[in-house]
Amino acid sequence: MHHAIEYHHFSCQGLQAGNRKRTPVGQLLRITRGAALLRLGQHELLLQAGSSFWLCADALAAFSPLSGCEYDQLNVSLRLDQPQQAGWLEATPLLDALLDSQARWQRPQEWQGAYGQRLQVILDELQQCAISQQGYHDLQTRWQALASGQPESLQQWAQQADAPVEGLALQQQWQLLQALRLLKGGSKPAQVASKLGYANEAALQAACQQWGVSGDDGQ
């Protein structure tokens, strides 16, 4: 990190298969459009637009934005006071407004100027926010049913009035994400295709193209 606090905004044109790793900084992940998957410990959480999640430093996690996802990422150096547990962060209206303004920032991004001062205020506000281990219970229950392939889970997902992503799109990207993880682990494409229900290697490659996965991720 160049500075003690860094802000980034990302727009994902395709599925991004995040690597499972420990990061030596605290991270705030705030979804502003679409949805993302966060693998934390033994859990695979669905983060939807409007939700924020705090990852404490050195938490073992894999963050995988789905196609069309937009999100803010705030990195906080261990030199600074910050929350010590991971969980759903209940962002205050002020924190949301400050992060929205950072995404639209047009002036020079100078740490010693207004930009850096704004980041300091964001960190101060972040530390006032409550963090919960449980969040969006109904959504997570429906997501887990879909992820495990339970009967009628797709229909139940469609019954949500405010689903963050269309059910079939979520199901297909989850299937592909599992495939990409196996490929990164050294499994052969033919084995992966067979294990995850693809007709053949060509079908797996077609899924990569459909969801905008780069050649490097799809190997």
Question: Model features per residue range: what roles?
Answer:
Residues 1-35:
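Generic protein-terminus/edge-of-domain signal
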Residues 41-57:
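Short acidic-glycine-tyrosine-enriched beta hairpin
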Residues 59-91:
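Ligand-binding loop in jelly-roll beta-barrel domains
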Residues 91-160:
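An amphipathic alpha-helical interaction segment
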Residues 160-175:
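Short, Lys/Arg-enriched anionic-surface-contact patches
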Residues 189-196:
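Short alpha-helical "recognition helix" segments of helix-turn-helix
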Residues 202-219:
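…primarily DNA-binding HTH/wHTH and HhH modules…
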